[in-house]
From Swiss-Prot:
GO molecular function: DNA binding; RNA polymerase binding
InterPro entries named in the record: GreA/GreB_C_sf, TF_GreA/GreB_CS, Tscrpt_elong_fac_GreA, Tscrpt_elong_fac_GreA/B, Tscrpt_elong_fac_GreA/B_C, Tscrpt_elong_fac_GreA/B_fam, Tscrpt_elong_fac_GreA/B_N, Tscrpt_elong_fac_GreA/B_N_sf
Keywords: Coiled coil, DNA-binding, Transcription, Transcription regulation
Organism taxonomic ancestry: Bacteria, Pseudomonadati, Pseudomonadota, Alphaproteobacteria, Hyphomicrobiales
The protein's name: Transcription elongation factor GreA
Task of the protein: Necessary for efficient RNA polymerase transcription elongation past template-encoded arresting sites. The arresting sites in DNA have the property of trapping a certain fraction of elongating RNA polymerases that pass through, resulting in locked ternary complexes. Cleavage of the nascent transcript by cleavage factors such as GreA or GreB allows the resumption of elongation from the new 3'terminus. GreA releases sequences of 2 to 3 nucleotides.
Coiled coil, from the record: 53-73
Pfam families recorded: GreA_GreB (PF01272), GreA_GreB_N (PF03449)
Family matches, as NCBIfam families: greA, PRK00226.1-2, PRK00226.1-4, PRK00226.1-5
Species this chain originates from: Beijerinckia indica subsp. indica (strain ATCC 9039 / DSM 1715 / NCIMB 8712)
Keyword hit for DNA-binding: yes
Record keyword Phosphoprotein present: no
Region annotated Disordered, chain positions: 1-24
Length: 157
């Protein structure tokens, strides 16, 4: 059974989503199913079928969240240190071609948000960076082609 590394913030966000789905969405959907059922013939009842589909999607997501949370390996990034890139590190890179700086934090899969500078530990960027140190050059294979970066800084915050 694989563990999912995640930050305490990532765990909290998934836990909040699980609670919302269990305590708000589930009762709302059950009520919608009951109301649609009261309209009679279920074979041609679009409201009923839509509510049942919503129930299926919600219950599937609940099961997925419960699984991820049960297998979460919470890593408190503030207790990490060093100059080697690992899970939780905030890495400052410079594109060796354009001199453009980028800052990424390496987080768990469910926490990733590239626009917010949070890349999944399983992403090509993170896989290329893991184990590298300040001053190292890395080649990252992106969908747009290969990129060369130099690591300027590694921080844990």
């Amino acid at each position: 059974m694989d563990k999912f590394p995640m930050t305490p913030e990532g765990y909290h966000a998934l836990d909040e989503e699980l609670k919302r789905r269990q305590q708000e969405e589930r009762p709302r959907i059950i009520q919608a199913i009951a109301e649609a059922r009261s309209h009679g013939d279920l074979s041609e009842n679009a409201e009923y079928h839509a509510a049942k589909e919503a129930q299926s999607l919600n219950e599937g997501r609940i099961a997925e969240l419960e699984d991820k949370l049960s297998r979460a390996e919470i890593i408190d990034v503030s207790k990490l240190s060093g100059n080697t890139v690992m899970f939780g590190a905030t890495v400052t890179l410079v594109d060796e071609d354009t001199e453009e700086e980028k800052i990424y934090q390496i987080v768990g899969e469910s926490e990733a948000d590239v626009k917010a500078g949070r890349v999944s530990i399983t992403s090509p960027t993170a896989r290329a960076l893991i184990g590298k140190k300040i001053g190292d050059s890395v080649e990252v294979n992106t969908p747009g082609g290969g990129k060369s970066y130099e690591i300027l800084n590694v921080a844990f915050q």
